[in-house]
Amino acid sequence: MLFALPALNDNYIWLYQRENLPLIIVDLPETDKLFAWLDKQNATIEAVLLTHEHEDHTQGVSAFKKRYPTVPIYGPQECEKKGATQVVNEGKILTAHYQIDVIPTGGHTKQHVSFLVDNHLFCGDALFSAGCGRVFTGNYAQMFDGLQRLNTLPDETIVCPAHEYTLGNLAFAETVLVEKSAVEKQRIFVETQRAENKPSLPTTLKLEREINPFLQAKTLEEFTALRKAKDIF
């Protein structure tokens, strides 16, 4: 089971469950909607994964810990001050039921990480559908290197970004990509989804390789120019 729970203005809390095992929760922007969903599902929780320190990903941590004090909360070093109980910057997490790969994807923040659970990539604000995160406390080289790491994953990888930014990203992609047919087709799909108040996500790495200009960038210089152009688009 994979579910994108809308939160705040345009965030998603991702919930992943293999068969009838306990849930994995990715990022905690808020808890009211999450607690209501968990109660309705009568769910048990294996772990929480935090991708980075920004408030719109962590401001629900305190309330979550009060309600679920024994659930481990994994995140990079920068998330320790936000309430993460287990620091992970790279490597593997082995829980009772899951093996989780931790992939460094800094740039948006210095220590941003992404998580690969089975074939599901939870990439926070590193990779979006048809886009990528802004560079804040990290740098362009970090962001480019992180996206290059993600770009080595298989086509069938299910990509689960943290924000509903797809339409705006597709609009930019149409202005910079030479081959636009896949972008135009995806834009029609996403417009239909959003008109029905449905998520445009998840996506796949196969599709992103066709519609995401940041994954097509071959050099740091090309990537940096694209990112700066998107910043003022």
From Swiss-Prot:
<feature type="binding site">
    <location>
        <position position="52"/>
    </location>
    <ligand>
        <name>Zn(2+) 1</name>
    </ligand>
</feature>
<comment type="similarity">
    <text>Belongs to the metallo-beta-lactamase superfamily. Glyoxalase II family.</text>
</comment>
<dbReference type="Pfam" id="PF16123">
    <property type="entry name" value="HAGH_C"/>
</dbReference>
<keyword id="KW-0862">Zinc</keyword>
<dbReference type="GO" id="GO:0004416">
    <property type="term" value="F:hydroxyacylglutathione hydrolase activity"/>
</dbReference>
<comment type="subunit">
    <text>Monomer.</text>
</comment>
<feature type="binding site">
    <location>
        <position position="125"/>
    </location>
    <ligand>
        <name>Zn(2+) 2</name>
    </ligand>
</feature>
<keyword id="KW-0479">Metal-binding</keyword>
<feature type="binding site">
    <location>
        <position position="108"/>
    </location>
    <ligand>
        <name>Zn(2+) 1</name>
    </ligand>
</feature>
<dbReference type="InterPro" id="IPR017782">
    <property type="entry name" value="Hydroxyacylglutathione_Hdrlase"/>
</dbReference>
<feature type="binding site">
    <location>
        <position position="163"/>
    </location>
    <ligand>
        <name>Zn(2+) 2</name>
    </ligand>
</feature>
<dbReference type="InterPro" id="IPR001279">
    <property type="entry name" value="Metallo-B-lactamas"/>
</dbReference>
<feature type="binding site">
    <location>
        <position position="54"/>
    </location>
    <ligand>
        <name>Zn(2+) 1</name>
    </ligand>
</feature>
<dbReference type="InterPro" id="IPR035680">
    <property type="entry name" value="Clx_II_MBL"/>
</dbReference>
<protein>
    <recommendedName>
        <fullName>Hydroxyacylglutathione hydrolase</fullName>
        <ecNumber>3.1.2.6</ecNumber>
    </recommendedName>
</protein>
<comment type="pathway">
    <text>Secondary metabolite metabolism; methylglyoxal degradation; (R)-lactate from methylglyoxal: step 2/2.</text>
</comment>
<keyword id="KW-0378">Hydrolase</keyword>
<dbReference type="InterPro" id="IPR036866">
    <property type="entry name" value="RibonucZ/Hydroxyglut_hydro"/>
</dbReference>
<feature type="binding site">
    <location>
        <position position="125"/>
    </location>
    <ligand>
        <name>Zn(2+) 1</name>
    </ligand>
</feature>
<dbReference type="Pfam" id="PF00753">
    <property type="entry name" value="Lactamase_B"/>
</dbReference>
<dbReference type="GO" id="GO:0046872">
    <property type="term" value="F:metal ion binding"/>
</dbReference>
<feature type="binding site">
    <location>
        <position position="57"/>
    </location>
    <ligand>
        <name>Zn(2+) 2</name>
    </ligand>
</feature>
<comment type="function">
    <text>Thiolesterase that catalyzes the hydrolysis of S-D-lactoyl-glutathione to form glutathione and D-lactic acid.</text>
</comment>
<feature type="binding site">
    <location>
        <position position="56"/>
    </location>
    <ligand>
        <name>Zn(2+) 2</name>
    </ligand>
</feature>
<dbReference type="InterPro" id="IPR032282">
    <property type="entry name" value="HAGH_C"/>
</dbReference>
<dbReference type="GO" id="GO:0019243">
    <property type="term" value="P:methylglyoxal catabolic process to D-lactate via S-lactoyl-glutathione"/>
</dbReference>
<dbReference type="InterPro" id="IPR050110">
    <property type="entry name" value="Glyoxalase_II_hydrolase"/>
</dbReference>
